[in-house]
């Protein structure tokens, strides 16, 4: 026993571990947390420009004021945030009317747009513009009348023309619409007789081409500077000449076959 006491007194003392406390006792010793502060947040709905302009136009009209009416109870943002978003603009307008009861003007709204609210949609037209628009309408109506009416109403020999526009009132005898005065340019170069002849020749050519079913290719232009075109030698195809006697024999043979076919009696059972 004396040796153990000497060792402990000598400086090398054995340190025992600290005792662990239960959780029930430790919770009572911990500091109390601070209470959480709740803050109210105001939410504003961003309105588009079109609806803002429409609301300003409707708000400018004078409306009768109703007195002795209790205001609607306002709800907190925590209970119904959606309702506050929808009715934010109407509540602001009611507050402005309560603050300024003497003024009958609409509340001023800061519209965040470069386009001003009070825009004249239909600017005043000049007298000249109105007259020109009437003339244009009259010209179109006269053109429709000239196309749809008979040639007796608007004859080409008529000298007096009361129209103030440049559209013609002439209808040809054939019933076709006029070329707005350009038909004179077509007929000015050649007289009527030559024009009729040329039209007849072109019609004959077109009928021949339709019958043959082939259009002759255009001949190449040999007068090209710096280009030498080799002449192509084309051989003419020899067509076999059929004699008249052979044609008569073929015709007689075909006629005999047709007669036999007509005499044959077909019986269907």
Curated annotation (Swiss-Prot):
InterPro entries: Sororin
Region (Disordered): 1-39, 56-110, 146-169
Low complexity: compositionally biased ranges: 146-155
PTM: Ubiquitinated by the APC/C complex in G1, leading to its degradation.
UniProt keyword Cytoplasm, yes or no: yes
Quaternary structure note: Interacts with the APC/C complex. Interacts with the chromatin-bound cohesin complex; the interaction is indirect, occurs after DNA replication and requires acetylation of the cohesin component smc3. Interacts (via the FGF motif) with pds5a and pds5b; the interaction is direct and prevents the interaction of pds5a with wapl.
Record-given protein name: Sororin
Species whose genome carries this gene: Xenopus laevis (African clawed frog)
Gene: cdca5-a
């Amino acid at each position: 026993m004396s040796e153990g006491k000497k060792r402990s007194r000598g400086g090398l003392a054995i340190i025992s571990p600290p005792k662990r406390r239960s959780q029930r006792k430790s919770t009572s010793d911990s500091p109390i947390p601070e209470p959480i502060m709740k803050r109210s947040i105001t939410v504003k709905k961003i309105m588009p420009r079109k609806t803002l302009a429409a609301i300003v136009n409707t708000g400018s009209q004078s409306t009768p004021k109703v007195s002795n009416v209790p205001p609607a109870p306002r709800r907190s943002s925590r209970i119904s945030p959606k309702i506050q978003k929808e009715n934010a603009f109407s509540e602001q307008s009611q507050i402005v009317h309560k603050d300024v009861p003497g003024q009958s003007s609409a509340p001023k709204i800061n519209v965040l747009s470069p386009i001003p609210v009070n825009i004249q949609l239909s600017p005043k037209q000049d007298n000249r513009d109105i007259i020109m628009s009437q003339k244009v309408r009259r010209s179109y109506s006269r053109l429709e009348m000239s196309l749809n009416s008979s040639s007796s109403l608007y004859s080409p020999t008529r000298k007096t023309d009361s129209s103030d526009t440049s559209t013609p009132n002439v209808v040809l005898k054939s019933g076709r619409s006029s070329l707005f005065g350009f038909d004179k340019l077509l007929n000015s170069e050649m007289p009527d007789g030559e024009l009729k002849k040329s039209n007849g020749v072109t019609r004959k050519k077109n009928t021949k081409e339709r019958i043959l079913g082939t259009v002759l290719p255009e001949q190449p232009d040999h007068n090209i500077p710096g280009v030498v075109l080799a002449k192509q030698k084309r051989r003419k195809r020899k067509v076999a000449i059929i004699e008249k006697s052979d044609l008569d024999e073929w015709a007689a043979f075909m006629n005999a076959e047709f007669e036999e076919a007509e005499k044959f009696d077909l019986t269907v059972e």
